[in-house]
Design a protein with these regions (language model features):
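Cytoplasmic helix-loop-helix junction between adjacent transmembrane helices
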Residues: 109-148
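Structural signature of the two symmetry-related core transmembrane helices
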Residues: 81-95, 179, 281-297
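Conserved MFS/SLC helix-loop-helix module at the cytosolic interface between two early adjacent transmembrane helices
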Residues: 64-101
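Helix-loop boundary and gating motifs at the non-cytosolic
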Residues: 6-61, 214-258
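C-terminal transmembrane helical hairpin of 12-TM major facilitator-type secondary transporters
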Residues: 280-326
Length: 401
């Protein structure tokens, strides 16, 4: 069993192994911050939950705004160097947040962090795009995602200690540890081999990506699909508490199931994404699975605690299948559909789909699943079926490679 788990998070490829090690350090720290950050700044510092949420929204908007320029930089300069610098600056910025007392300073620092993070993420995606071709690149992304889930899950568990102690010092310790994790990740990233930029430094910024309508529409459709991540993080917790008789702790149980499934099966399922044509079919299949899970979630309303818990568990199991398959398909489409010399900017565009979904998704989901209940889940199911079919139609002329 242990050997199986290790095989799903430790790549046989030494380059991917070094990438994932740095990623684990980084996401371990992120898990700590995401658990205590909003609580610390909202209630310990006293900025208020709404104002803190607004600051995160502004930061996300900054990240979206620099996606394309950050991609241009990733194509023209060393992805390794950009990755190292981004980790260092994020660590310093996060460390400064411990001393924040006002909303304006907090927001400025958060925007700076999001700004730097976008450059680092685009550089890392550009690097992975050069690891290999086709299925090998998808497998590398799968290892990264499995380790991400393991890191965030582990960091969340450690942050639980701070929540239990519930003192300013405990919360500050978690934030400082996250800041240090960025610096350690930068150190680990120095062991990653250099890869050459795909473009020359003197080449002008090419905005033709914005005219690549096929890629832009695929990005938008994938952004619509990524709404399912917010179903897990926002819709399900609110739905369970407000509309079902399942115990609140069951939310943690099904989320733990999701985390462990990604760690154990993301790499295995990635081996099925052989080429772009296969990925297009898998994207539609994944969308269907998520649609079915929405219908199952909706059925948990109005039944006793045992049945509600069982129904939610079944819904999450189907949802996990859609998430695993859909993630692999999304990575293949994102990288193989792109101009291979401009992976940085193309992956920057692709990330904008996620960003827009994160910005508008929470309000939409709450309005649907709480505002109109089971009908809202039905609408979501129809949405995912439509997204999958539209992607299939949009890319139907692509031949297998």
């Amino acid at each position: 069993m242990l050997k199986s788990i290790v095989g799903n998070i430790v790549s046989p490829d030494p380059t991917v192994r070094k990438l994932t090690f740095a990623n684990f350090i980084n996401t371990f720290g992120n898990g700590m911050f995401h658990t205590v950050g909003i609580i610390y700044f909202s209630f310990i510092v006293g900025l208020g939950a709404q104002k803190v949420a607004l600051a995160f929204t502004i930061g996300a908007a900054v990240s979206l705004a620099v996606s394309v320029p950050a991609g241009h930089i990733a194509d023209r300069y060393s992805p390794k160097t950009i990755g190292i610098l981004s980790f260092i600056f994020q660590g310093l910025i996060l460390g400064a947040q411990v001393f924040t007392k006002t909303w304006h300073i907090f927001t400025i620092l958060l925007c700076l962090e999001y700004f730097v993070e976008r450059f680092g993420q685009n550089a890392r995606m550009s690097y992975i795009a050069q690891v290999g071709e086709g299925q090998k690149r998808v497998e590398a992304r799968a290892y990264m995602r499995a380790v991400t889930n393991l890191g965030i899950g582990s960091g969340t568990l450690i942050a639980g200690i701070a929540l239990a102690i519930n003192t300013p010092t405990a919360y500050k310790t978690m934030i400082v540890m996250d800041a240090l994790s960025f610096l350690l990740a930068a150190l680990a990233y120095t062991r990653v081999p250099n890869v050459a930029p795909t473009l020359e430094k003197h080449e002008k910024f090419d905005w033709s990506v914005l005219k690549d309508h096929r890629y832009i529409l695929a990005t938008a459709l994938n952004g619509g699909f990524t709404l399912h991540f917010l179903i897990q993080n926002i819709a399900i917790p609110v739905w369970v508490v407000k509309e079902t008789n399942a115990p609140r702790w069951w939310i943690s149980a099904i989320m733990l199931l999701n985390t462990m499934a990604i760690v154990l099966f993301q790499v295995r399922t990635s081996k099925r994404s052989k080429n772009l044509q296969t990925a297009i079919k898998q994207f539609q299949q994944a969308s269907f699975y998520v649609a079915v899970s929405c219908l199952i979630y909706g059925a948990s309303h109005g039944v006793n605690a045992v049945f509600a818990s069982a129904i939610l568990l079944a819904g999450m199991a189907i949802h996990i299948a859609g998430e695993l398959i859909g993630s692999n398909a999304s990575w293949m489409i994102a990288m193989d559909l792109a101009d291979q010399r401009r992976q940085g900017v193309y992956q920057g565009i692709w990330s904008m789909g996620f960003g827009l979904s994160d910005m508008v998704g929470p309000s939409i989901l709450v309005a649907l699943v709480i505002g109109i209940g089971q009908l809202g889940w039905l609408i979501l199911a129809a949405w995912f079926v439509l997204i999958g079919q539209l992607m299939r139609w949009h890319l139907r002329k692509i031949k297998s490679v």
